[in-house]
UniProtKB/Swiss-Prot annotation:
Quaternary organization: Tetramer of two alpha and two beta subunits.
InterPro entries: aa-tRNA-synth_II/BPL/LPL, B3/B4_tRNA-bd, DNA-bd_dom_put_sf, Fdx_antiC-bd, Fdx_antiC-bd_sf, NA-bd_OB-fold, Phe-tRNA-ligase_IIc_bsu, Phe-tRNA-ligase_IIc_bsu_bact
Main location: cytoplasm
Keywords from the named record: Aminoacyl-tRNA synthetase, ATP-binding, Cytoplasm, Ligase, Magnesium, Metal-binding, Nucleotide-binding, Protein biosynthesis, RNA-binding, tRNA-binding
GO molecular function, one term: magnesium ion binding
GO (cellular component) term, any one: phenylalanine-tRNA ligase complex
Compartments reported by the entry: Cytoplasm
HAMAP family per record: Phe_tRNA_synth_beta1
Co-factor(s): Mg(2+)
Gene3D superfamilies: 3.30.56.10, Bira Bifunctional Protein, Domain 2, Ferrodoxin-fold anticodon-binding domain, Nucleic acid-binding proteins, Phenylalanyl-trna Synthetase, Chain B, domain 3
UniProt-recorded name of the protein: Phenylalanine--tRNA ligase beta subunit
């Protein structure tokens, strides 16, 4: 909403400058988007009357004038405006004046004739003006007075961003009421005296749509001069509020809208057949609106109709046929209350709106209609003349205000400020919120203009606004937090996330609601936990594995031409359990594409099972896991392993099944893992080990074993018989081919031995190696020579 600061200060004038007033309104919830000057800066311009005006002897289009500018003598000024004439009063820039754009006025000669000033147009002063030529002022404009003072050009224009719940602030009356409440300044509203009827003419009013229209007032005014000019003061206020002047009657209704907040409409009485009825539109009816758009009316549309036809769309826009023109002599003034729910959304459906619909759909004061019609009638009689008939009023169903309770203790708790009941009561009174008080509990009745007071929190907000948010102390809350001991056998989940991110994985977060197909394909789950009210058909069950979500993200990245994808997710899965549902946490990862990002130093190779196995080992470190061949519906039958810790299965690792690679359009198979989060964050009791200062000894052990014997079996056998000096055993080569019999394979292990107290000798090393060889022989292994 845009309005003039001077207009507001005629209602309430707090001891604040423009900037302070702007800040006050913003902090009270009426955000000031901008303030701009009503006119650009200029000086030295006064009101002057043209006393003489003759044709310039050397120029056909110039006039030589002598003007009275209140200086005590006539001033000669050469002027080229077409509307300059004897007797007109106009703005006059005297020598030394500075006009917008730093244009300085000084004595000069024009075609040989001396000119000591400049007669100004509105454009030259930066003031909107419809007249082509000089700005013509009223005949009673005081000669010699500064034009800035006379036109109020030192005004500031405020633009407020009013929230939808504060329709009561969409008027000068409403904003002034707020400023008075916030500052304690005296509110000086316009006195509204009822206009005594001087004629008996009426038009009967009937409300059929009683829930949509709670109150309707109408008044006949006859013998008006609709062509009368709108007073300059009213025109200025309208223009500074963003509305253009149209005609006196229309300007008056718009003025009431801005001043009082009550939308009004004026009908040409001669175009009304019979009485006025507020009803729903009927099938087949249409209306040509004031914006020259024809609306095919529907029963959901509220209309103002006479005995023969619709005249206007209630609360939205009047009709072109029944509108007032400068030729109108008799008018019918309308002032009504329409329920917000009856108007809301209708203008947007039609593709156009109005200032009236904007206010009605947010809520207009349902006690304001009579004041508005009396104020409008008074202005019509003063500006356009005429005789007014009595006001006809019909009341249907008006909103009912429920009392709201406000506890003083609750105010203190929410705002963090101890406030006495007297202080709270004073704030409520300043906001026109009537109340009764008993046992520190206020029972508050909201006024007719406040549609947003419904619950206790609404009242607490009002108290806070007037008390001032800046006055609420910024007290930091006292916390009872204390540092908790961190268990040594577990690590934080965030540390696990950082570890995976450090290994070039990117974390994803996916929905726990998944496609039923994913559960069947990746978990072999034919009885997933179903949602009673899924948000989409493809999100109808709860996941029991994280694999489906990772595969889906991979498919999306492949479609976007990503060459290399490494993902992980930490989240819950949902399983059926003996006592209902279990929600264990899992960590899962997926790797697809080249092992390394494209570079010149290494050949591009696809990631494989063992790359991801290394990531899993790093994830579980220092705990050693055992890997056993396994079958899983999501994984390749021959490239899948169960991850076991202390003899218990804690996860699975493998290459995605070729069937799902093809079904989900993945080009080639990713390698995935999924682990119980509890196993992934466990790290065992850390035991400090001294660093030996003696050189280690390495021996290699090459064994021929059957294809069925796994590395894990051999490592397990070694562990049972390894000597104390054996620090580490690692596989470094697997060979099949020439020199190795069919059905056999060669496995080569490096054995690292070290003692913390001495250098090892062959006498120490050989028994240790022999013990390992004996352990391997129990699995049918032979030393390869």
């Amino acid at each position: 909403m845009q309005f003039s600061e001077q207009w507001l200060r005629s209602w309430v004038n707090p001891a604040l400058n423009t900037e302070q007033l702007s800040d006050l309104l913003t902090m009270a919830g009426l955000e000031v988007e901008e303030t701009v000057a009503a006119a650009p800066a200029f000086s030295g311009v006064v009101i002057a009357e043209v006393k003489e005006c003759v044709k310039h002897e050397n120029a056909d289009r110039l006039r030589v004038t002598k003007v009275d500018a209140g200086t005590g003598e006539l001033i000669q000024i050469v002027c080229g405006a077409p509307n300059v004439a004897v007797g007109v009063r106009v703005p006059c820039a005297l020598p030394g004046a500075v006009l917008p754009g730093e244009f300085k006025i000084k004595p000069t000669k024009m075609r040989g004739v001396e000119s000591n000033g400049m007669l100004c147009s509105g454009k030259e002063l930066g003031v909107p003006e419809d007249v082509d030529g000089l700005m013509l002022l009223p005949a009673d404009a005081p000669v010699g007075q500064s034009i800035r003072d006379y036109l109020g050009l030192d005004d500031q224009l405020f633009t407020l961003k009013i929230t939808p719940n504060r329709a009561d602030s969409l008027s000068i009356r409403g904003i002034a009421r707020e400023v008075a409440a916030l500052t304690g300044a005296e509110l000086k509203p316009v006195a509204i005296e009822p206009v005594a009827p001087s004629i008996d003419d009426v038009r009967p009013v009937k409300i059929e749509s009683r829930q949509a229209c709670g109150r309707y007032l109408g008044r006949v005014v006859k013998g008006v001069n609709a062509a009368a000019p709108t007073p300059a003061w009213m025109r200025r206020r309208l223009e500074r509020s963003g509305l253009r002047s149209i005609s006196a009657i229309v300007d008056i209704t718009n003025y009431i809208l801005l001043e009082q907040g009550q939308p009004m409409h004026a009908f040409d009485l001669a175009k009304i057949d019979g009485g006025i009825t507020v009803r729903q539109a009927r099938a087949g009816e249409s209306l040509l609106c004031l914006n020259e758009k024809t609306v095919e009316l529907q029963p959901k549309h509220l209309v103002i109709a006479d005995d023969a036809k619709p005249l206007a769309m209630g609360g939205i826009m009047g009709g072109e046929h029944s509108g007032v023109t400068v030729a109108s002599h008799d008018i019918f003034l309308e002032s009504a209350f329409f329920a917000p729910e009856a108007i809301a959304g209708k203008a947007r459906e039609l593709g156009f709106g109005s200032d009236s619909s904007y206010r009605y759909e947010r809520g207009v004061d349902f006690a304001l209609q009579r004041d508005a019609i009396e104020r409008a009638t008074r202005l019509v009689l003063e500006i356009c003349g005429g005789q007014a008939g009595p006001v006809v009023e019909e009341v249907a169903e008006l909103p009912k205000r429920q009392a709201v309770q406000l506890r003083a203790a609750r105010v203190a708790k929410v705002l963090g400020v101890a406030m006495s009941a007297e202080r709270i009561g004073d704030i409520l009174s300043r906001l026109s919120l009537s109340y009764t008080l008993a046992d520190e509990v206020f029972t508050v009745q909201a006024p007719s203009f406040r549609f947003d007071i419904e619950i206790e929190e609404d009242l607490i907000e009002e108290v806070a606004r007037v008390y001032g948010y800046n006055n609420i102390p910024a007290d930091a809350p006292r916390s009872g937090m204390r540092m908790l001991a961190q268990p040594e056998d577990k690590r934080p989940v965030d540390q696990l996330r950082h570890l995976l991110a450090g290994r070039d994985y990117q974390e994803v977060v996916s929905y726990a609601f998944v496609d039923e197909r994913w559960e069947r394909d990746f978990a072999g789950n034919d009885n997933p936990i179903r949602l009673q009210n899924p948000i989409a058909s493809q999100m109808s069950v709860m996941r029991s594995t994280l694999i489906g979500g990772l595969v889906d993200v991979l498919a999306g990245n492949i479609n976007r031409k990503q060459p290399r994808v490494r993902l992980f997710e930490v989240a819950r899965v949902f399983l059926r359990g003996g006592n209902g549902f279990d929600q264990p946490e899992k960590v899962a990862g997926l790797v697809w594409g080249p092992r390394l990002a494209e570079q010149w130093a290494a050949k591009s190779e696809r990631v494989d099972f063992f790359d991801v196995k290394a990531d899993v080992e790093a994830l579980l470190h220092p705990i050693k896991a055992e890997y056993r061949k396994a079958a899983h519906p999501a994984f390749h039958p021959g490239r899948c392993a169960e991850v076991r810790v202390d003899g218990k299965a804690v996860g699975v690792i493998g290459e995605l099944h070729p069937q799902w690679v093809q079904a989900y359009g993945l080009i080639n198979a990713p390698v995935l893992f999924e682990l119980d989060l509890a196993a992934a964050i466990a790290r065992g009791r850390i035991k400090a080990q001294p660093v030996s200062k003696f050189q280690p000894v390495r021996r290699d052990l090459a064994l021929l074993v059957d294809e069925a014997v796994t590395v894990a079996q051999l490592l397990s056998a070694f562990a049972a018989k390894r000597a104390e000096i054996v620090a580490d055993i690692a596989l470094f080569d697997v060979y099949r081919g020439k020199g190795v019999a069919e059905g056999k394979k060669s496995l080569a292990f490096s054995v690292l031995m070290q003692d913390n107290s001495r250098t090892l000798t062959d006498e120490d090393v050989e028994p240790a190696m022999q013990a390992l060889l004996e352990a391997a022989s129990e699995l049918g292994a032979q030393l390869r020579v």
